[in-house]
Amino acid sequence: MTDFFAGIPQIRYEGEGSSNEFAFRHYNPDEVILGKRMEEHLRFAVAWWHSFAWPGGDPFGGQTFNRPWFGDTLDLAKLKADVAFEMFDILGAPFFCFHDADIRPEGATFAESKRNLEEIVDHIGTRMEGSKTKLLWGTANLFSHRRFMSGAATNPDPDVFAWSAATVKGCMDATMKLGGANYVLWGGREGYETLLNTDLTREAENAGRFLQMVVDYKHKIGFQGTILIEPKPQEPSKHQYDYDVATVYGFLKRFGLEKEVKLNIEQGHAILAGHSFEHELALAASLGILGSIDMNRNDYQSGWDTDQFPHNHPEMALAYYEILRAGGFTTGGTNFDAKIRRQSLDPEDLVLAHVGGMDTCARALKAAARLYEDGSLEAARAARYAGWETPEAQAMLASSLEEIEARVLAEGINPEPRSGRQERLENLWNRFV
């Protein structure tokens, strides 16, 4: 036991009438919604990097947090893990996520970093034995160190490609050893700053081959989890190749991986790409590649990825409605890729940020489930496209342009526009949130 969270009680559900800030008002893990426990719907995960590794810096200032585990030794990494599991237990969090660089100190060589990772993974595995918290996904940090400044899989230097591939192998091994449900790849440096020094064809082909190797290794070691890519349009790169859901799907199709890889979609990244969160979720679901989500929000005025905790439940309800329509999570879940503000220095701030985020998502899920169970929105959607269920419409899809023209002339087809009824549906939505 550490004393970092001393005096903070285990968070329990007390209902909407509770005035206890260290309690859930909406998140009741055992509440059954649409035939499944709320905990199983939401599958919350705590992000190791923002919660325990982030020093509180921003582009204009450095560290504001003074955590007792900050440092570059294995003993401090183990202390960080001990503190992390204490918070997982306080929250009753079912899952966590990590990058390799979050949990182990960087070594002077690849071999030393590999040994450090293996040792800390053993320590985390021991902590997991006494906790309900499991691993939602692991990943490799292929963007922070200066060696990755020109990319990892897309780097012009083959040695960086090699280092990156070896790093991913080790992280996949660690994820499998800890029983992870997924493995994520995020290409923060897989992009370019200027076309003047960039070979787009080579970089795309190398990225595709890299991903094929990842999938091959997954099958070789018998990893039963899902491989996920996380789209983001820019930041830190000027232009990233995994721009959004549509772009990544095209990439997967190009390299024959659309049946092997799904997506981890982040709210903040969707906004940066000029989309709504629900758009990206709905599109991924329609393409069969919706895997998991990173839950956060951006400051809509700042123009960059602020990774704040969610607090707008009507907005989140739109997202969870699309997840419910898609059948819910299988191996995926709701990872809080969110960080407290750099002025929020206290241990209580870290816990309460997660309490608020979990309550916001639970409230959103309940609203989405009520509307989904009511069926009115789906009925309106079906009615709008009902004409396509007729034999004539189905026959038209199997015919040719010449045959369709002949039918239009013969039947004198002259369609009149029909209302999309958007305002009615928005009013319907508001009744449930």
Curated annotation (Swiss-Prot):
It is an enzyme of class 5 (isomerase). It comes from the Bacteria. One of its GO terms (cellular component) is cytoplasm. It catalyses: alpha-D-xylose = alpha-D-xylulofuranose. Binds 2 magnesium ions per subunit. Gene3D superfamilies: Divalent-metal-dependent TIM barrel enzymes. Its EC number is 5.3.1.5. Mg(2+) 2 binds at E266, H269, D305, D307. PROSITE patterns: XYLOSE_ISOMERASE (PS51415). GO terms for molecular function: magnesium ion binding; xylose isomerase activity. Keywords: Carbohydrate metabolism, Cytoplasm, Isomerase, Magnesium, Metal-binding, Xylose metabolism. Mg(2+) 1 binds at E230, E266, D294, D337. The active site is at H99, D102. Its cofactor is Mg(2+). The keyword Methyltransferase does not apply. Homotetramer. Belongs to the xylose isomerase family. HAMAP family: Xylose_isom_A. This is Xylose isomerase. It comes from Cereibacter sphaeroides (strain ATCC 17029 / ATH 2.4.9) (Rhodobacter sphaeroides). The gene is xylA.
